Amino acid sequence: LDDHIVWAKFSGASWQGDGFYYSAYDAPQKGREFSNVNSIQKIYYHKIGTPQSQDVLFYQNPANPMRFYSVYVNQEETMMFLTESGAGSGNNVYVRDLRQPNSQFIQMTSNLDLQYSLVETIGDKMYFLTNDGAPKNRLMVTDLAHPGFNEWKTLVPEAKDMLESVTFADGKMILNYMKDASSHAFV
């Protein structure tokens, strides 16, 4: 591909349709490439085969210029998640129903000191690994009709060992716990 993206920083890529979303900053002034302060991270949509100058600005939040933002579109391209971080040790999550034209992001969480990691989406259900109310993590589930954190239900409660990760595969959940400095997986 001839596509080349510059000034993307603290970014991944999330595919949707014939392009992807990425996070970037404005190009710094000449001579300040390595000393410029990163502020007002923006999310753009890049269509494959087009120059970066044609990328569409998708999201920015000038009211919080030092925060980081990323977008994730689930595999079915039915939900889009916006993650906000940089003002604490955690993140906030917002969701948007892509099946509804012109839908807006709905805030799911509101504590930047806690962590919320999307594990999987199945139909309208969303599964999150979080330390909210569980310092050693727990797995919670919610759906698009009830995305606010107060509506989430605990699926796997906090245990005495740290729940490091959860993977969904072949209709099963694989729970990975840290115990005595070694990983232990349970199906």
Write out the residue ranges for each language-model feature:
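Peripheral, non-catalytic segments that deliver or gate enzyme domains
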Residues: 1-187
